C-alpha cells in the first residue's frame, strides 16, 4: 500500500501529469481535436501552477494555518523534526548532504531546542532505495556537526512517512507533548496525523514557500511550491479516505 500511494501520488503531480498530457497528444495526433485539447490543457496547467495566482490560492492557505513558533517549551521537552531527503555525496559533511528542505527543518529544530531546557531532539526518516544510510542517521550527524550533543538525539530510522513517524513517536514517548517541526505547507497534515494518534503536538513550521510577487511572473519556484501544495491536498484526501 505504501508503494502504491507513492506511485499514484507522483503520477498525478503537476510536472509528471503535464508530461503525460503532452505524451498523450503524440499518441492521438490522428485525432486533432483531442490532441489540441491535451496540449492546451498541459500548457494551461503549466502557466497556472507556475504563477503567483497558484501560490496565493494553493500554497498560502496551507502555510498560514500555523504561525512561526517562539513560545518557550515548559516541562519535559521533546522536539521532533520530520524527515525529508538527503544525497550520498562523496566527501561531503552530513550538513552538506541534506536537501534544502531537510536543512531548513533541522535548523528550525535546533532553534526550538533553545526554547526549552535539556530538550531531546527526535529525527526520523528511512534510507529508501537510493541512499546508503537512513535519513534519520544523516540528520543526527548533521545536528552533531551543528553543535548538538549526540546523547540528546533519538533516531527513528524506519519511519517512511508521517503516519509512521507519528506511530514511532507514540511507541517511544506515549502521549508526551512534542514540539513538531516540518515544512509550513506540510504542517496541517502532520498536525492532523499526530492529533489522530492522540498526541499533543505544538506546531513549529519552517521552509515557507509562499512569496508575494508580480502576477505576470511565471517561475520554477512557484511551480515547485504549487506541486508541494497539491501533494498535501492529495495527502489529506488519502488520510480522509483511510479514516472512513
Residue positions per predicted region:
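Hydrophobic membrane-insertion alpha-helices, especially the h-region
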Residues: 37-52
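Alpha-helical transmembrane anchor segments
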Residues: 12, 16-17, 47-48, 216, ...
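Membrane-embedded alpha-helical segments of integral membrane proteins
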Residues: 1-28
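Hydrophobic alpha-helical transmembrane segments
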Residues: 20-21, 37-40, 229
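A structural signal for short, hydrophobic/glycine-enriched beta-strand patches
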Residues: 52-222
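Membrane-interface helix-boundary motifs at transmembrane edges
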Residues: 28-36
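Hydrophobic alpha-helical segments of integral membrane proteins
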Residues: 3-8, 54, 58-62, 230-237
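C-terminal capping/extension of enzyme domains
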Residues: 215-244
